[in-house]
Each structure stands twice: as structure tokens, then as C-alpha cells.
Amino acid sequence: MARSLKKGPFVDEYIIKKVIAAKKAKDNKPIKTWSRRSTITPEMIGLTFNVHNGKSFIPVYVTEHHIGYKLGEFAPTRTFKGHRGSVQKKIGK
């Protein structure tokens, strides 16, 4: 279910403050965040966020195509190692 339009997108307040400060100072340093739930807004275009995936921080450079998505969508939390059977089939043939 989508968020109500009258409420607007959710963004943690400290991220908004850091984005405004980075734009004002024209700083290219990545913004470190644990807030995977925050929605990407147009003010964030051109900034880099280090998004925590539970183990490490993944750099996410925000472009215009990312608007409306959550920061966490670009920092995967799980690594897929492949299915066990597919490797054995290749070796057996």
C-alpha cells in the first residue's frame, strides 16, 4: 500500500539537515546513514550516501532516476551465492 499523498514522502530529519548543509557548503563528502527507509527526494540529486546494509556501508550516488525510491533499495542486504544444484550439473556434464 502506498503512502498517502497528503502526508508526503518520509525522510529522516537528520538526513534533510545534512543534505541542506552539504548543498550549502558544496561538499562532495558522502553522507553516512543507517536510514534505509528514507525516500529519495529531488534535493538529494548529485549527492553520495553511504547506506548501511547490516554489515558495511554501500555508496549510493543519487541521480534523477532514483527519485521516489528508498535509500535501502540500492544497498542489498543479502548476497546470492547461487543454487547448489546448478554448479553440480555443470561439473557432471
Curated annotation (Swiss-Prot):
PROSITE patterns: RIBOSOMAL_S19 (PS00323). Gene3D superfamilies: 30s Ribosomal Protein S19, Chain A. One of its GO terms (molecular function) is structural constituent of ribosome. Transmembrane segments: none annotated. Keywords: Ribonucleoprotein, Ribosomal protein, RNA-binding, rRNA-binding. InterPro entries: Ribosomal_uS19, Ribosomal_uS19_bac-type, Ribosomal_uS19_CS, Ribosomal_uS19_SF. Belongs to the universal ribosomal protein uS19 family. This is Small ribosomal subunit protein uS19.
